[in-house]
Amino acid sequence: MSNLNLFETNQNKSISIMTQDITKLLDPLTEKFDGFSIKTLNVKHVDEIHELLNKHYIEDNDHIIRIIYSRDFLYWYLKYVPNNFTIGLMYKNKLVGLITALFVDMIMYDNKIKIPYINFFCIQNKIRKFGLSNILIEELKSRLLKIGVAYSLFTRMNCQNSLDKHFTSTIDFAIPINCPKLKSVGFIPDDEKLMNWKIENNPLSLMVKTDILSVTSKLNVHLQHLSVRPYLTEDSVHHFILPKKNIVYTFVKRDSRGYVTDMVSVYKHYAYILETGKIISNAQLSFYYNETMDLTQLILLLLDKLINYGFDQLIFRNFYDNGKINITRFETNGELNYYAGNISMPITCPNNMFMIPI
């Protein structure tokens, strides 16, 4: 890890990045809880991770749905997490807690930095009251400090009682695709007009490997007006954007010479309805750029394509340029706060930032 030259910053007056953690690491907490231990995990443990997350991962504030992921999605995600940064909390050889750190290239107010994005933080429901989450947090902090990293990015559902200072927050919106199914589970009113997203001669097609160079360059240009944004490489585009069945779907439009002029990408995850046990398929809007049409036109073409891949609704957050999407949508219960640990930075408007929505 230390040989990868991960952490180059060029600090300016807008933000301050701490290179040393000012808090004292707690004593090994597992010693205080009999039977618990820490275990380093990897993709070989995907079945255990899948079971834990699908039963105990985050729910919306009203406890209506739980976000769940397919086994294939988790395997794909974990492959990009560096060794030693998929950390499990075990109780008598059973996985009861998880935390991961995915290192992402970000530009934050003109500072280019590779930063750990903390994700899939999960503790089994029945043991949350014992404060076991601190075990995972302290273990991750310790491993990061060993490679000289005292900062991180993370998110959490909006909590009215939280005293933590976030630098921005976003709200999720949904555009119905499979209206009959969404009506049957109560996600949209019975009297809501059915939407027909079918478009004849849709110019979008799935992205292919030969598009990676062009897409990488154009996305970085399209994102450059944002103060907080990813910096994409051909490697990260290959992993996070190139289509992979049941994980990521990316569509492009080409001109008469075959050059990509427009692109749009979504991730696939699911909403598990706690009361009924029914499952809704979500397309989570991610990266895009548009040169030959406005954003609403691009999303309309996307909705037509998503019908053929079994998606029930398109979900998007009100960051990036997403406020320009002029299509009937429904506000969800998904409100997310964004934090920069050990980074002092300005409050940031959602339309001035973008993070990979995974």
Curated annotation (Swiss-Prot):
SUPFAM superfamilies for this protein: Acyl-CoA N-acyltransferases (Nat)
Q: Highest taxon of the source?
A: Viruses
Protein's UniProt keywords contain Methyltransferase: no
> Gene3D superfamilies from the entry?
3.40.630.170
- For this protein, what reaction is catalysed? N-terminal glycyl-[protein] + tetradecanoyl-CoA = N-tetradecanoylglycyl-[protein] + CoA + H(+)
Q: Does the keyword Acyltransferase apply?
A: yes
Q: Name one GO molecular function term.
A: glycylpeptide N-tetradecanoyltransferase activity
EC number(s) from the headed UniProt entry = 2.3.1.97
Q: Give UniProt keywords alphabetically.
A: Acyltransferase, Transferase
Q: What is this protein called?
A: Putative glycylpeptide N-tetradecanoyltransferase
Question: Organism source for this protein?
Answer: Acanthamoeba polyphaga mimivirus (APMV)
